[in-house]
Design a protein with these regions (language model features):
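Residue-level signal for glycine
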Residues: 101-107, 167, 271-273
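Short beta-strand edge/turn micro-motifs at domain boundaries
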Residues: 168-170, 274-312
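Short, solvent-exposed aromatic-acidic interface loops
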Residues: 112-117, 175-178, 295-304
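Acidic, glycine-rich flexible loop segments
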Residues: 117-158, 163-164, 241-271
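Surface-exposed acidic loop/strand-edge motifs in secreted or periplasmic proteins
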Residues: 39-134, 181-257
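Short, surface-exposed coil-to-beta transition loops
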Residues: 93-95, 154-159, 273-280
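Alpha-helical oligomerization segments
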Residues: 159-178
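Bacterial Sec-dependent N-terminal signal peptides
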Residues: 1-36, 41
Length: 312
């Protein structure tokens, strides 16, 4: 069931694209899921001059500056020549440049993404790339969310960019909508749980503290403790031996059964086999629509919910 008021609030929270241009204000428009610790340090980042007149565009570019632990992160949307007209207004399809430091040393300098490099075959003219203002950060990785949307609509795709401390970059597909079209926070949270958990586990040297932070964000205390002991070779949540992070491209989250507070997820392995799991959800205290993952059990294709209006 799509809840209209909640849906609008969720889209505003997830796809918001307006942030103060003032550098002092920028520090207050960031709310990391793990509290930031500011430290005194020499200036690592010197901002490049941008002489573009942004007043001609419908939406102003976002800038993010934040410090978390020994991470220092700077992100800048900027105009790189891509624009289009929508409803008589000019929209820029901004690119984003990242400068990321860890322990006082550069990890990514001038790393650039745009809608073509991030969306690949899903690139569509007339859509614009929006940068999420809140980053999720662990000791080993910085996760940046993007909404790729048709202006003034909820016709959007989502991507997550993982910038890892070892210098590797990974791109993940997520969604705010279930396979049946339900838009709800539980869908987003399950996608992000799988994305962050799998990314952390698949690093060359997984970090226990990073994994714990991710699990504590999205799971109940008891289930987080269970998953903390798991690996990619054998994992209760993932359900396949030697899970490959690229399999997440096919991940689907299905409509929640409100009687049991469970939903089915599935993905396709490289050998073509479909894997189904039933995710158990527990309502967060003092909330109406927010859930934590409390468990997982095996499922089959027969457990999938019926598609609305007889769709297949």
């Amino acid at each position: 069931m799509i809840r209209p008021i909640y849906t609008l609030a969720l889209l505003f929270f997830v796809l918001t694209t307006v942030c103060a241009r003032n550098k002092k204000d920028d520090a207050h428009c960031i709310g990391n899921i793990f509290p930031a610790t500011k430290t005194d340090s020499t200036q690592l980042y010197i901002e490049e001059e941008d002489k573009t007149d942004y007043s001609k565009f419908a939406i102003q570019p976002i800038r993010v500056d934040t410090i978390w632990g020994d991470w220092e992160i700077h992100a800048r949307q900027f105009y790189d020549g891509k624009k289009f007209t929508y409803d008589k207004t000019t929209h820029a399809d901004y690119a984003v440049r990242f400068n990321v430091f860890k322990g006082g040393k550069p990890v990514f300098k001038g790393y650039k993404v745009n809608s073509k490099s991030l969306m690949g075959p899903n690139y569509t003219k007339g859509f614009e790339l929006g940068l999420f203002e809140q980053f999720e950060i662990t000791p080993t990785s910085v996760y940046i969310g993007f909404g790729y949307c048709e202006p003034e609509t909820d016709n959007c795709l989502e991507r997550v960019l993982a910038l890892n401390a070892d210098g590797t970059v990974r791109k993940y597909e997520t969604s705010i909508a279930s396979a049946e079209g339900d838009i709800d926070m539980y869908v987003t949270d399950i996608y992000w749980l799988y994305t962050l958990y799998v990314n952390e586990l698949s690093l060359a040297t997984p970090n226990a503290a990073s994994i714990q932070k991710v699990l504590n964000k999205y799971c109940t205390t008891d289930f987080a403790k269970q998953l903390q002991r798991e690996t990619l070779k054998k994992n209760l949540l993932l359900g396949s031996d030697q899970f490959d992070y690229q399999w997440l491209r096919s991940l689907e989250v299905h409509l929640m059964d409100e009687k049991t507070n469970t939903c089915i997820v599935n993905y396709k392995r490289a050998d073509g086999k479909m894997v189904y799991k039933r995710i158990h959800l527990q309502l967060k205290p003092e909330t109406e629509y927010e859930y934590l993952v409390s468990g997982v059990s095996d499922a089959t294709e027969k457990d999938l919910p019926a598609m609305p209006n007889g769709e297949e």
